[in-house]
Design a protein with these regions (language model features):
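Histidine-centered metal-chelating micro-motifs
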Residues: 62-63, 82, 98, 102-108
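Short acidic-glycine-tyrosine-enriched beta hairpin
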Residues: 88-102
Length: 138
């Protein structure tokens, strides 16, 4: 018991020490992507393991049907997100989160009548080679 207490006392200051050299300010890369309409991605990613984006899409925007070789999670900041799958279409409103599992066929679109604003987390981070486009859900 004394050894455990001694270990905790010695490790506690180390475990809670703040190393300010690890903090960083991230300036996003702005990407313009042309689907049926142009959308904007603000990419805050700092590694290939994890992507972090803001996505801004106009009214009427839609992607083609895709299968993503990464998990996509996010939250709707403004507008209505539509996720179209083979059997159904799900809609997500402001302050609702969503998860698109890896390798799921989906068409992502703005399902509302105002611009769509999302914050997205991708695991692993985005690479063009990890996105496959399809003509249909079959």
């Amino acid at each position: 018991m004394k050894n455990i207490l001694l270990t905790l006392l010695l490790l506690s200051p180390l475990a809670f020490a703040e190393d300010t050299s690890e903090y960083q300010r991230i300036t996003p890369k702005e990407l313009k992507i042309q689907d049926n309409l142009e959308r904007t991605i603000l990419d805050y990613s700092t590694s290939d393991e994890l992507g972090m984006n803001q996505m801004l899409a106009p009214i009427g925007w839609t992607e083609p049907i895709v299968s993503l070789e990464f998990e996509l999670r996010g939250v709707v900041i403004a507008g209505v997100l539509g996720l179209e799958f083979k059997e159904e279409t799900a809609k997500f409103n402001v302050n609702e989160g969503f998860v698109i599992p890896k390798n799921t066929k989906v068409r992502i679109h703005n399902a509302g009548n105002v611009p769509l604003h999302l914050v997205e987390i991708l695991r692993p981070g985005y690479k063009e080679s990890l996105v496959k486009e399809f003509e249909s859900f079959e």
